[in-house]
Amino acid sequence: MNMPSWLIFLLTGWTFCGNFFACGGLDYDYPNYENEEEKNEAIDYKDPCKAVVFWGDIALDEEDLKMFHIDRTIDLTQHSNEKLGHTTGGLEEHDLSKKRGALYQLIERIRRFGSGQENTTANSQKVDNNQSGKSKKIRIPRAATSRTERIWPGGVIPYVIGGNFTGSQRAMFKQAMRHWEKHTCVTFIERTDEESYIVFTYRPCGCCSYVGRRGNGPQAISIGKNCDKFGIVVHELGHVIGFWHEHTRPDRDDHVTIIRENIQPGQEYNFLKMEPGEVHSLGESYDFDSIMHYARNTFSRGMFLDTILPSRDENGLRPPIGQRTRLSKGDIAQARKLYRCPACGETLQESTGNFSSPGFPNGYPSYTHCIWRISVTPGEKIVLNFTTMDLYKSSLCWYDYIEVRDGYWKKSPLLGRFCGDKLPDVLTSTDSRMWIEFRSSSNWVGKGFAAVYEAICGGEIHKDAGQIQSPNYPDDYRPLKECVWKITVAENYNVGLTFQAFEIERHDNCAYDYLEVRDGSSENSPLIGHFCGYDKPEDIRSTSNTLWMKFVSDGTVNKAGFAANFLKEEDECARPDNGGCEQRCVNTLGSYKCSCDPGYELAPDKKSCEAACGGLLTKLNGTITTPAWPKEYPPNKNCVWQVVAPSQYRISMKFDYFELEGNEVCKYDYVEVRSGLSSDSKLHGKFCGTEVPEVITSQFNNMRIEFKSDNTVSKKGFRAHFFSDKDECSKDNGGCQHECINTIGSYVCQCRNGFVLHDNKHDCKEAECEHRIHSSNGVITSPNWPDKYPSRKECTWEISATPGHRVKLSFSEFEIEQHQECAYDHLEVFDGETEKSSILGRLCGSKVPEPLVATGNEMFIRFVSDASVQRKGFQATHSTECGGRLKAEAKPRDLFSHAQFGDNNYPVQADCEWILMTERGLRIELNFQTFEVEEEADCGYDFMELFDGHDASAMRLGRFCGSGPPEEIVSTGDAVLIHFHTDDTISKKGFHIRYRSVKYQDILHTK
């Protein structure tokens, strides 16, 4: 039987009524992040995390169990209940008794179903034979009929991205969707008013998605912790489109071997497979390369133990499985069959391109059907120009024709239907998508047609809502672009603009690349903002129904750009009833909210106000405490203190005691400190837990402190005192040439990198540029950063890190004069303490280099500029990586467990390997100066292992934890492998080893 490449969701059987979803499925470890989404997430979607039981990463109810073939060699009664939900954590939403009850129901039903397979088949034949006898075909109750309601109509999938994702995550989601669009005829569109759509959310079950379209409302695709990787999102979208995992297909045993003894206890059920009658074969062979296939070591007892072993190919090689980088050829072929994509046509995503009828210019075949989808960046328009047109001409273009539609699919507005030999006029879309369909049904032979298109950015937009993105978003914008948009919404409304992502080349004055926004319809309208850098601009609201935007990029550094939504906006607070608010009404884009005067808080109706803690404080210093201090604070409190000092003063807040209910994102009880008096002022921090915050100093002469508690756990609270200090730097920069640093009672001037302070303590002059760095991490920059580096400058950095740890250099920004051989301005990095060490790289240009890693704990860096062109320079972070190869010599050397040994405990989830080597004939002696590692009877949590050779296959000298080895250890050969592993909980001081090479005779003499 020729089975499909993927287990497609074309489920069958009228008895089926369960809710299925599938997840990423590769061994991710998810803690419980229940309810970690933003509180303003108001979409009532179908949540894939709420399942009775899980089949690995697929949710099942009792009826769903009929879908799967059960291999009776698996004894599901041996499963460990505690292991359920390993990859997704979905069962953590139920208490343990519910887990166990559901599991045993699953086990019992699977066992009954597995043992009754033969009878089921016999009974089905008997039922068929009792029918009229006109049909000779054997009918199985769960026949292989397609569930068409699970296919997205027209291949169009509307989506919404939740508000709790960063700009880079949103860009990556869009890249993943464009990847599917590029290779198939599936189309993802931002949801407007569609009833059924997907919602990208952050859910506690990690990487999760339903399989296919659920219908009757939104459905979630969960991108949880550690899931925000391109390949994982492409995989999850595969489930949305309608695919199961490859390794569960019925004929998988012909292609892979399941090695059960290597499977983690309690996880054997993840390797069950589906019934042949439950999937629809589309003629595709087993696809080892599928992005929907599990890896070889999924749910393995050990990293290097296989659980799924692919069969050897004709060359005797085992194909790789479990890739998460891109769609395979089989993935693409199967998706195109599932959605019945025409064999002719494609999705065009470049800014310019061309296409033509099949066989052009030698004639097109009859009965041809082609579809081209042009998709460019939102905010761009498509200009389509036919350069040749030679089709059979008929009345109303009935037979052979080409149709162009202004949108993403066949129901979009028609721009024109063409045939004959007359060239159509140039066609321009109103948005960023265009749909072109070609059909032929005559036997007439003509050349066909050819067309070219171009994406143009900017233009006039007359819509009440939409999206604008920089050219080529979510990829880097193109150089030398200038785009101007004029947005017009309905009369008597304003234009609201909110940014989802923002990353434009940074410059103090936004001189290179920038986005300019003006309050009106022209470049002469009042300026709202001139934006660049990586911080998202605040929401923008025009004063009329028009907004003018201009994006400019120069010819050098290109970034990801921006994505923004616009909408028609009204001020609900301007209504006569003040929006129904008792005291204050705060207008927001697309909505509004009520707030209260200081000393009051919102009542449960969210409209009226009642007395609260907090208030307006105008003293130069004072104390703030939580309600009921020093007793536990009450539940459901909202306190706002507004502290105001005289002009040119700054306010500092110091917490003396701090104890609030805590979690990682401070979503229950917390205190927020802001510069300014409003709730949307600059946030200095959101604090909870028991760690006392650092001293906070306001940017201006006012500060807002807000405390909130929920209705559950209460703690002692906090006590803080504030004091005000005059900021001499706020006026004329304190007279400093470069930077002014305010201090309590005074101020100091500070110079940028490459300069020193003049004797007058205000001016800066060029300095010697030699740096010696002995810290494990930090930041280095070119002189005068972030302004252009000076000419004729040479700077050096000698970085020395903790012994046993390699120096790593990572660049965040880079712009040095370009030359093919970096002969002019350049940056050199050497693998050692001087420029005589081997070179790791000689760098110039505007492309950010890949990270550079030294082989040891020293790195030498030299920057040189000539007398001509100056650029922005570079900014880089130096850090350390543990492990590496170290040479043991007669003189003792040191090795430390972690780079911050002595200052901090070792980090969690560390995994480091050092190979100590010496000359042939010598041995290596290890003396433990310090050893303090989490203790456990079998050293199963944190430990250090020693192997008497170059790798872990050598004889193990011991596994140590607690206080370590009782005495020094000597190898029997010229190499020792040290392996240090920590788990994700308790950490200790670590270890300090002093090692050297010794002669065997010396050891005997010493002993």
Curated annotation (Swiss-Prot):
Binds 1 zinc ion per subunit. SMART domains: CUB, EGF, EGF_CA, ZnMc. Residues 116-133 have a biased composition (Polar residues). The keyword Disulfide bond applies. Glycans are attached at residues 164, 354, 385, 621. CDD domains: CUB, EGF_CA, ZnMc_BMP1_TLD. It comes from the Eukaryota. Residues 569-610, 725-765 form the EGF-like domain. SUPFAM superfamilies: EGF/Laminin (SSF57196), Metalloproteases ('zincins'), catalytic domain (SSF55486), Spermadhesin, CUB domain (SSF49854). InterPro entries: BMP_1/tolloid-like (IPR015446), CUB_dom (IPR000859), EGF-like_Ca-bd_dom (IPR001881), EGF-like_dom (IPR000742), EGF-type_Asp/Asn_hydroxyl_site (IPR000152), EGF_Ca-bd_CS (IPR018097), MetalloPept_cat_dom_sf (IPR024079), Peptidase_M12A (IPR001506). Disulfide bonds join 185-341, 205-227, 207-208, 344-370, 397-419, 457-483, 510-532, 573-585, 581-594, 596-609, 613-639, 666-688, 729-740, 736-749, 751-764, 769-795, 822-844, 882-912, 939-961. GO terms for cellular component: extracellular region. Residues 1-25 form the signal peptide. Residues 115-139 are annotated as: Disordered. Keywords: Calcium, Developmental protein, Differentiation, Disulfide bond, EGF-like domain, Glycoprotein, Hydrolase, Metal-binding, Metalloprotease, Protease, Repeat, Secreted, Signal, Zinc, Zymogen. GO terms for molecular function: calcium ion binding; metalloendopeptidase activity; zinc ion binding. One of its GO terms (biological process) is cell differentiation. Its cofactor is Zn(2+). It is found in: Secreted. Residues 344-456, 457-569, 613-725, 769-881, 882-998 form the CUB domain. The active site is at residue 236. Its EC number is 3.4.24.-. Zn(2+) binds at residues 235, 239, 245. PANTHER family: METALLOENDOPEPTIDASE, OVOCHYMASE-RELATED. Protease which processes procollagen C-propeptides, such as chordin. Required for the embryonic development. Predominant protease, which in the development, influences dorsal-ventral patterning and skeletogenesis. This is Tolloid-like protein 1. It comes from Xenopus laevis (African clawed frog). The gene is tll1.
